[in-house]
Amino acid sequence: MIYTKRLWFSNGIHHHYSTKKILPNINIEYFETLINNTDVNLLPLEKDQTVKELLVFLCPLIFDPNVDSHKVVLDQDIDMIKSSATNFYENISQSEVEEFHKEEINNNSTKPVSHGLNSKLLKKSNKIAERIWKEGGMYSAAIEKIIYWLKKAVTVAENEIQRQPFDKLIEFYKSGNMKIWDEYNIIWIQDTESIVDMVNGFIEVYNDPLGYRGSFESVVSIKDFEATKRIKTISDNALWFEDHSPIADKYKKKKCSWYFSKGNHSCCGIW
């Protein structure tokens, strides 16, 4: 049960920080006994798959420390894509991924988009394909549910500046267009008044060894007015902290711009 709880906490067989594979404190024989004595109807069998075939698939993944040893490998001396257990890529090498994005990235753009943030790259018949995470694309069933609830949120938005990001995010999930994702974020960051806030999308990229693809995250938070007041007090006095910081005067700023920040009373989310 300890092993099960560790998997729940880390959302998989790899530790959420070290990304190292979590090994169970039981042996294979005991695990096989548990599976063989479980009702077949309760096992996650593929079509026409036998219990024996399921065990052949599962046992190396669970017990062999050399199989998918790390979710993310950052050793630049080896192929980081092939060495990582992340599912953002399939049958493709690091050099192929880098070359794929090199062709589409415009370094001269004043508003570059995050190419690859919402897609999976795979190679079939020596051709690289990109599967976009959107309505009608990869993960469509789940994304349609997201769109459903965002449409509900539109009807109860506190104000116009809160409603606009909802509409834009729906547009993004329908199209998968990363330019729309940028437009959404620009609108979202301008909402400094709403009591309820939301973060939703394929955002954090640390599960991708190359930092292209984002993992889904959704958080709803409620503003803590007292905490926000304290944070604003610090922000309003930023120049005082700059003046009294233990660094050489030539490195100190003469003027500090105030930025918006807020404290959250409570959060509810999934990562």
Task: Give each language-model segment a name.
Residues 1-104:
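Extended, Lys/Arg-rich, non-catalytic nucleic-acid recognition/anchoring regions
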Residues 61-271:
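Fold-level signature of zinc-dependent metallopeptidase catalytic domains
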